[in-house]
């Protein structure tokens, strides 16, 4: 099990809110149903006309605006986008219908990875994002029927939580080994010809096929220099997740034909088997299949055959018990602590209430994603660590021993306790974790200030699941 959480294929790198899945809104469902019928009727020759339909474009525009995101290489942001479309859309639409539209290069953005290195995103212009979203809405219903029930990423009505629950079920059934496969630089290594071959089996409109090929080959701009692309589907645009699922459906079908129990979320694939020997055989044979049939390479360093509780999948792991329980992987806690540390930088001049207000969305969103956890001890420990950090901020803000003693007395300590604590010559971190600060500023104090409790949030969310 490898990833920290479901990887965001967009301008934001990793958002816990994605666990909500991709369920269609009422308006989108109506449009999608109508487009599905029309697309199926016209996919032989008129699919681009469906893409450019007013209702489809309106829905795509709403999606792009809601997702916000950074500007592309043209520098046009959300605020200017509407006026830009009013001026240029008639020409753009005419080029799309004529099969002559040329996408602009994507803007390179490097996102640091937790363990070093970077994830490369390619941010399209808002115009290209709109067109890709319109394409996605029409193509998705055409290909969705072919996707595997064991594929959970970037699909309507499916999400990371379903994948994690399925993984737990497989282990509970006795598959106590996992083949954790890491596809080496998957989004950078997608073979264009192979992907286009798969697309052409379902899409008859050559204008659509040419446009997708142009998006795949659109250059990437960094430092004012555009680099051509001969492989890969850059993360950052609405079309990339769908294209990855289309290509990796070949892997899903191969695993199904062999009778394997597996979960795939985008390029994260875990296969569950009953013995280490079986796992080693599966690892070797599937690695050959990926290389021979899909032109993809398994990262031998990051991949492994192991016990499920030794790996992590979408930020979760499992306990070793006969009836395993879901737990939050240690690396996921580390990621949260790093985000909290970043949020608490430069807080000396701010009130504690302001700091807590900025911290709460991080804590609330993180726990919303990890609400499936069935172990609470570490959640309690992280709660305590957050309060420790906030007490440390108070201690540092007070600066002088007499100020500290005065504030400790205001918080209820006796004069003797307050002065002994304030003048103990220990450091801020030691004092903020000591008994005098815990008595003066207990959990109830932070509750009154509105600090989100991870444990309380977990219990509340689990009650409504």
Language model segments and positions:
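Non-catalytic terminal/accessory segments
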Residues: 1-465
């Amino acid at each position: 099990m490898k990833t920290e959480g479901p990887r965001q294929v967009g301008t934001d790198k990793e958002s816990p809110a994605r666990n909500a899945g991709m369920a269609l809104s009422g308006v989108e469902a109506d449009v999608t149903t109508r487009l599905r019928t029309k697309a199926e009727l016209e996919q032989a020759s008129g699919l681009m006309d469906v893409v450019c339909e007013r209702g489809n474009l309106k829905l795509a525009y709403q999606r792009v605006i809601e997702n916000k995101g950074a500007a592309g290489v043209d520098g046009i942001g959300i605020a200017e986008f509407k006026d830009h479309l009013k001026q240029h859309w008639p020409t753009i639409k005419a080029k799309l219908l004529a099969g002559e539209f040329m996408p602009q290069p994507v803007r390179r953005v490097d996102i640091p990875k937790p363990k070093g290195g970077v994830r490369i995103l390619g941010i399209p212009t808002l115009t290209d994002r709109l067109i890709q979203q319109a394409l996605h809405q029409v193509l998705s219903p055409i290909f969705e029927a072919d996707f595997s029930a064991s594929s959970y990423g970037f699909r309507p009505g499916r999400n990371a939580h379903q994948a994690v629950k399925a993984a737990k079920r497989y282990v509970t059934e006795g598959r106590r080994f996992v083949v954790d496969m890491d596809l080496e630089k998957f989004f950078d290594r997608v073979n264009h010809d192979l992907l286009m071959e798969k697309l052409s089996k379902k899409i008859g409109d050559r204008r659509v096929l040419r446009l997708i090929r142009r998006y795949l080959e659109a250059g990437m701009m960094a430092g004012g220099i555009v680099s051509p692309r001969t492989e890969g589907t850059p993360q950052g645009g609405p079309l990339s997740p769908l294209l990855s699922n289309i290509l990796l459906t070949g892997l899903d079908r191969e695993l199904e034909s062999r009778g394997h129990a597996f979960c795939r979320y985008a390029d994260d694939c875990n296969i569950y088997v009953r013995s280490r020997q079986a796992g080693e055989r599966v690892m070797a044979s599937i690695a050959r299949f990926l290389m021979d049939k899909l032109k993809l390479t398994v990262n031998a360093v990051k991949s492994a055959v192991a016990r499920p509780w030794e790996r992590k999948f979408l930020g979760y792991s499992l306990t070793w018990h006969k009836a395993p329980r879901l737990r939050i992987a240690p690396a996921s806690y580390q990621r949260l602590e790093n985000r909290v540390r970043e949020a608490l930088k430069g807080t000396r001049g701010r009130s504690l209430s302001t700091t807590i207000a900025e911290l709460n969305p991080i804590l609330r969103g993180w726990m919303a994603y990890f609400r499936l956890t069935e172990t609470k001890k570490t959640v309690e420990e992280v709660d305590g660590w957050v309060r420790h950090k906030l007490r440390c901020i108070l201690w540092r803000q007070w600066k002088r021993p007499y100020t500290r003693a005065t504030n400790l007395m205001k918080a209820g300590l006796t004069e003797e306790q307050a002065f002994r604590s304030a003048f103990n010559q220990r450091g801020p971190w030691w004092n903020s974790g000591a008994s005098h600060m815990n008595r003066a500023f207990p959990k109830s104090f932070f509750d009154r200030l509105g600090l989100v409790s991870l444990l309380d949030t977990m219990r509340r969310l689990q009650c409504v699941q």
